[in-house]
């Protein structure tokens, strides 16, 4: 079996991070990794805050947040006046859901590739308002055309108040044809929220090119920002309807400031986020994207080969730029949340490798990521040792 050639490592890239060198960190997609330069920038801001907290919070902080927001919005291809910084995609989705004023009979439509925490937020809002949540099953092997048709026929104009779709799915590492899905929903008058948790830094598509009513993406994954940094982008017709989860002193300032200002929080991560973009650009954005996608594809093939998965049975990512890939586990392995957590912990403890393990629709999957600090030999070692560990279950 021919395995694709791995990409050439980016010289010195691993030294930019403070990761434990005794561990193979193959799950960048879950919590990211903050470059040392970004950590230091944030610490300088924290030192400033602690030297004079009153001055830090009361003299110019709102303007400094807006300045950082403009940098991040420009990188995303988004309107800075329509962009609010939030803690993460889950928080941004909650902001949108609670701002819709759902009523009994309304529905929120999603697919079964959605992120679990967002699904929990939908369930809570529906329970509070009397609306209902409906999930469309989408086969892992569905083509883009089939996916669009599934959503088209699933929409119920007049009842569907919101369609939530992923730009790149978390549990299945599948790139969705987001712009086409948004267009289909718009034809039927249904607003769309795009969960773009993994898009910033990984995918080249701009927010404007997608055209969704609401778009929310994490910058603390593939754009090297401190954790707790995400952007919620809202089209003009919705901005005055969007309300913060916590009302505070900037409530009368309108969107986006009233969403951003959540009382006394540590805002230094947002202020340091542009340093993450500088780090990414210094490495070369296109170079990093190509490297990470090629490395993830290599890891998928070598680990899949070790587990006896034929190349044609490896899940397709839906696009060339995807830096996360799935490997099916043997039948019966990690099919439940508890079993997946247990296997992930065993792999971490016994193989010194951090990976994502998830059960989806009755099948367990390993999700592997590629990042500039990874090297091909890390996937090779996992491929050699994983079959023995699985045989010991």
Predicted segments, located by residue:
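Conserved N-terminal alpha-helix of the aminotransferase class I/II PLP-enzyme fold
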Residues: 52-91, 292, 306
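Active-site phosphate-binding strand-loop segment of PLP-dependent enzymes
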Residues: 132-134, 142-201
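Active-site PLP attachment segment
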Residues: 210-250
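Structural signature of PLP-dependent enzymes
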Residues: 56-58, 257-301
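Conserved PLP-anchoring active-site segment centered on the Schiff-base-forming lysine
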Residues: 81-82, 97-121, 132, 339
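PLP-dependent enzyme catalytic core of the Aspartate aminotransferase-like
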Residues: 15, 335-339, 345, 349-393
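Conserved PLP-binding catalytic core of the aspartate aminotransferase-like
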Residues: 293-297, 306-350
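Glycine-rich phosphate-binding segment of PLP-dependent enzymes
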Residues: 20-22, 30-62
């Amino acid at each position: 079996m021919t395995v694709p050639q791995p990409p050439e490592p980016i010289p010195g890239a691993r030294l930019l991070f403070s990761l434990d060198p005794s561990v193979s960190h193959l799950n960048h997609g879950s919590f990211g990794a903050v470059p040392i330069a970004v950590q230091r920038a944030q610490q300088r801001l924290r030192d400033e805050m602690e030297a004079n907290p009153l001055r830090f919070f009361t003299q110019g902080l709102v303007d400094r947040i807006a300045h950082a927001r403009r940098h991040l919005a420009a990188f995303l291809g988004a309107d800075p006046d329509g962009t609010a910084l939030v803690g993460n995609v889950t928080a941004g989705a909650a902001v949108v859901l609670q701002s819709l004023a759902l009523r009994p009979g309304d529905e929120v439509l999603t697919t079964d590739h959605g992120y679990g925490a967002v699904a929990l937020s939908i369930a809570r809002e529906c329970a509070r308002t009397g609306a209902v949540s409906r999930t469309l099953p989408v086969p892992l092997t569905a083509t883009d055309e089939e996916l669009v048709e599934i959503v088209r026929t699933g929409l119920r104009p007049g009842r569907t108040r919101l369609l939530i779709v992923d730009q790149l799915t978390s549990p299945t590492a599948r790139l969705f044809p987001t712009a086409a899905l948004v267009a289909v929903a718009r034809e039927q008058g249904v607003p769309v929220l795009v969960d773009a948790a993994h898009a910033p830094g990984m995918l080249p598509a701009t927010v404007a090119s997608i055209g969704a009513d609401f778009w929310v993406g994490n910058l603390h994954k593939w754009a090297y920002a401190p954790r707790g940094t995400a952007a919620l982008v809202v089209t003009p017709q919705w901005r005055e309807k969007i309300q913060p989860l916590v009302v505070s002193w900037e409530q009368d300032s309108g969107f986006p400031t009233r969403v951003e200002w959540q009382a006394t929080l540590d805002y230094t991560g947002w202020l340091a986020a542009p340093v993450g973009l500088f780090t990414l650009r210094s490495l070369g954005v296109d170079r990093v994207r190509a490297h990470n996608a090629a490395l993830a594809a290599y890891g998928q093939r070598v680990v899949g080969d070790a587990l006896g998965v034929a190349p044609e049975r490896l899940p397709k990512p839906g696009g060339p730029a995807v830096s996360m890939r799935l490997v099916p586990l043997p039948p019966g392995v990690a099919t439940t949340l508890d079993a997946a957590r247990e296997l992930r912990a065993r792999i971490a403890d016994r193989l010194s490798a951090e990976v994502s393990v998830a059960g989806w629709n009755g099948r367990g999957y390993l999700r592997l990521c590629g990042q500039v600090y990874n090297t091909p030999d890390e996937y090779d070692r996992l491929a050699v040792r994983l079959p023995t560990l699985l045989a010991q279950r």
